[in-house]
Amino acid sequence: LAILLLLKPFAPEGTTPISAGMVAVMIGFNLILGPLGEELGWRGLFQEHLNQRIGWLEASLLIGAIWLVWHLPLWTIDSPHAQIALPLFAAHCMLYSVIIGAAYTISGGSILPAILIHLTVNLAANFSIFAGFKDPNAWFSASLVPLLLLALGAISLVYFRTGQLGVRWLQV
């Protein structure tokens, strides 16, 4: 959401007012349809198992690729996702997966940070429409570099907090 606030002045179109009720509905809707169920599987089941086998970073990238495939059917129906350039969405999936995987690893395996980050990601994409990014590609493009920096910061944070590079074959 901080990225959204930083990029808001660069939005191509004017803002749209949003009510507190609309925000509450969006939070509930987004929580139930995405982060709760998905993160129970992605982090609750896969991340820990894969972390032990291939390292947290490789596990996060693999989960990011699976996450992308999981969302591909949304491009075959009339949905907001169908308007997003697939390479942009793929980059977001991979970067978010690294950030979420880092939070999961630093937290000692709690899925709560994963759920909260995933929820925030979904809400930022939804709120970007109200902030003037009517074309989802504008938001996905504008937020790509800040996300890359956050992902690199997350990798560094895991390394400095745990000593884990996250890539099994690089471990000495």
Which stretches of residues belong to each language-model region?
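C-terminal membrane module of polytopic membrane proteins
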Residues: 112, 117-172
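Hydrophobic cores of alpha-helical transmembrane segments in multi-pass inner/ER membrane proteins
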Residues: 29-39, 97-98, 148-161
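Membrane-interface helix termini and inter-helical loops of multi-pass transporters
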Residues: 7-18, 47, 75-82, 130-138
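Hydrophobic alpha-helical segments embedded in the membrane of multi-pass proteins
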Residues: 90-102
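Membrane-helix interface segments
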Residues: 19-20, 54-58, 85-86, 107-112, ...
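Juxtamembrane helix-entry segments on the extracytoplasmic side of multipass membrane proteins
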Residues: 13-28, 77-91, 142-144
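Aromatic-anchored segments of alpha-helical transmembrane domains
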Residues: 1-5, 65-74, 119-128
